């Protein structure tokens, strides 16, 4: 497959994720869209690394996945806290976590 196709797919996935972040109000859906955007960036890194015969993009994508795993833990903990406090996963309720 042509590397341009992978870059087009990466841009498409990033656009879908950005639209989901901007248009959705459910925190879980927004969180999934952020993860989709991170995976799109990883695909672009790996594609550029393959195009230039360099491993730096693949290593950077690996470290991005490690950071994303830690982000999942923290993000889900915050979403669970919002749900326990407000019985809703709406993004609009996120500013209500103040004591």
Curated annotation (Swiss-Prot):
Keyword list, A-Z: Cell membrane, Membrane, NAD, Quinone, Translocase, Transmembrane, Transmembrane helix, Transport
Q: Which GO terms describe its biological process?
A: ATP synthesis coupled electron transport
Annotated transmembrane regions: 3-23, 28-48, 59-79
A Pfam cross-reference name: Oxidored_q2
Localization annotation: Cell membrane
- Gene Ontology MF term list: NADH:ubiquinone reductase (non-electrogenic) activity; quinone binding
List S-S links within the chain. Answer: none
Q: According to Swiss-Prot or TrEMBL, what is its membrane topology?
A: Multi-pass membrane protein
InterPro entries cross-referenced by the UniProt entry = NADH_UbQ_OxRdtase_chain4L/K, NUOK/Mnh_C1-like
Any one cellular-component term (Gene Ontology) = plasma membrane
- Catalytic activities: a quinone + NADH + 5 H(+)(in) = a quinol + NAD(+) + 4 H(+)(out)
- The enzyme's main class, written as a single word, is translocase
EC numbers for this chain: 7.1.1.-
Similarity field: Belongs to the complex I subunit 4L family.
Q: How does it assemble?
A: NDH-1 is composed of 14 different subunits. Subunits NuoA, H, J, K, L, M, N constitute the membrane sector of the complex.
Q: What does this protein do?
A: NDH-1 shuttles electrons from NADH, via FMN and iron-sulfur (Fe-S) centers, to quinones in the respiratory chain. The immediate electron acceptor for the enzyme in this species is believed to be a menaquinone. Couples the redox reaction to proton translocation (for every two electrons transferred, four hydrogen ions are translocated across the cytoplasmic membrane), and thus conserves the redox energy in a proton gradient.
Could you tell me what this protein is called?
NADH-quinone oxidoreductase subunit K
Native species: Nocardia farcinica (strain IFM 10152)
Q: Which gene encodes it?
A: nuoK
């Amino acid at each position: 497959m042509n590397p341009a196709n992978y870059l087009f797919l990466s841009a498409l996935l990033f656009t879908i994720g950005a639209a989901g972040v901007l248009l959705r109000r459910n925190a879980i859906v927004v969180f999934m869209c952020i993860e989709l955007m991170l995976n799109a960036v990883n695909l672009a890194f790996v594609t550029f690394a393959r195009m230039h015969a360099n491993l730096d993009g693949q290593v950077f994508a690996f470290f991005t996945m490690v950071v994303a795993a830690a982000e999942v833990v923290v993000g889900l903990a915050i979403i669970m806290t919002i749900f326990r406090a407000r019985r809703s996963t709406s993004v609009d309720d996120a500013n209500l976590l103040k004591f």
